[in-house]
UniProtKB/Swiss-Prot annotation:
It comes from Caenorhabditis elegans. GO terms for molecular function: acetoacetate-CoA ligase activity; ATP binding. This is Acetoacetyl-CoA synthetase. Present in most cells of the organism. One of its GO terms (biological process) is fatty acid metabolic process.
Amino acid sequence: MTAVSANGKTTEKHENGAHTNGTTNGTTNGSMNGNEISHVQKLQPVYYKPPQNLETFELSLRNHFEEKTNKKFADYREFHRFTCDNYGIFWEDLLKLSDVKLHQNYNQVIDHNLKINERPRWFNGATLNYTENVIERGTATDIAVLNASIEETVTEYTYDNLRKDVYRIATSLRNYGIGPGDTVCGFVPNTYDTLVAVFATAAVGAAWCSASVDFGPAGVLDRFRQVHPKVLFTVNHVTYKKKLIDQTDKINEIVKELPTLEKIVVSDTFTSVKFDATKYNQSDKFSSLEEFKTPIADVVLPFVYTPVPFSDPLFVMFSSGTTGIPKAMVHTVGGTLLKHIEEHLVQGDSKKHDRMFFYTTCGWMMYNWMISFLYSKGSVVLFDECPLAPDTHIIMKIAAKTQSTMIGMGAKLYDEYLRLQIPFNTLYDLSKIHTVYSTGSPLKKECFAYINTYIAPGALIASISGGTDIIGCFVGGIKSLSITPGECQCLFLGMDIKSFNYMDEEIINSDEQGELVCVTPFPSMPSHFLNDTDGKKYRDAYFARLEPFWAHGDFVRVNHSTGGVEMLGRSDATLNRGGVRIGTAEIYSVVEKIPHIADCIVAGRLVEEGMDEEVLLFVKMVPGQELTHSIQAAIVSKLRNDMSPRHVPNKIYAVDDIPYTSSGKKVEVAVKQIVSGKAVQKASSIRNPESLDHFVQYRL
């Protein structure tokens, strides 16, 4: 392992992965000053266009199917249609061409007689191991992981380091009897130790479930109680905004309520405070990570991974829980792996030299998505701190220092960069970046322009959208198409996406807004929900609305000239004005540009016995500003002129704060329920749950 300096050059080497100091050279403190602001001119983006003689995995895959079927696909859209019409062949050939290692072969890809709502199983008879597939492909001496800190130190771990650490933890888990059918939990930050724990868990055939360290005990228990874990990985301290935060009280409260726990493993690698078992209740169950690790000399080599059936559990993921106890979704070993291979290798064209830096916590599905990137034989960059305070530049500093080639984060963070107008690429070397990911909420057109001006001109902007429900994406980016600002470039291969109008009819050759629907099975559907023996929760979540099709809950507009998709917000938060549906993102795109408005959220409130909706707009003002009549008039005028009279709200109110989930999504449905007079539980996944109190006074 090596630590690298601010210019990306190696400065010191440590076999144990530790760094001797936190100093860096040639970096700024991230504060905005007059010189930076003066550099900002009108945005002049350089948008991505496919180069001549483009060579990608997707084009190779397209050529494979052309030769196999004696067809010629005119473009990506024709190829996409083929992969949906022939989804069994597509996923089978992708599994073979991407070299997925199976211990036992399959006897059936899928039963094509079963519809998507019947949840057919994939690759029946096949056995494999997720960890083996993901971490055994890379060259031993190549860098697998770069662990970055708020102090701007970066510690590197090779594939050999990673494998040996996984073997040591996996051997210890086996010694505690952990294997298929068991669940291991992590109350953890996004660090190297966590990554090792995830891979070690999957290496022995057990399922992994995690919660972010910014969750309170109640939020963690809402999730972990459902899975009955035997082992818990956690940390004694975390840092946030450069402040050291003791986790002892949280851990004690969590462990007290989880009687199935047999072992609690505490990491102290990335803090200055060492593990002390006497601080914990039930201290006999606790050990440090170093104590828990089997010495490498005692690990039986070559290490033997536990093969499990394709549809065995890999990850237990949770719904946001914004309107109740989070639903526990079980994602399969093979389905997750194959979907992530398609997204990283085919859609993303990830290669061995790539470095992926996606800013995420371990409570967001993007973490699970990110770690599968190692299947490409490249590197992942890990960072778990505040991205804006005290240093608004920290993400880009780390991207530059690690020479990341692919970066990603929630769309709200790009919104903040746009507001600050920081010309990052004039301050740091971001020249290696060729792909920029955004997700969590719709990415504004202005953010496209900002990214392709001040972060990575000419880079592919992959605005991706899917969800925890599929542990992946329905739509996103592809290198064989040009960028259209404001749109997700394309429908992903093998994902048979349609848009249905308010009469539940498919929208064909029209740019009409509609509900995003998937009509054929795909591998990364949850196998089941926990505590759902009759399957009712599963059916209600996806099929009750448009059975037999999967209704995902997104309101979209498919651009039939480009093939791109504009995400308009959640369909359950979509506004209904006289029978015309309006996506909330359209209102935000106008209102958030108006001076003196910091943020906003909109909700529909049913009136006239549910036949129509009254639209309420709530705005958060910039500190020191008030919602005046002139600002209200400006909102009305801009919405009427830029959108339509139907976009004009019935009422506009000022509130102190806007509620967000921990992954950066506005909590629209909860606000809608509150103003409609319904009781709403304050979910632990809401970053600022007290903000919901502001809306109670506006209920019916």
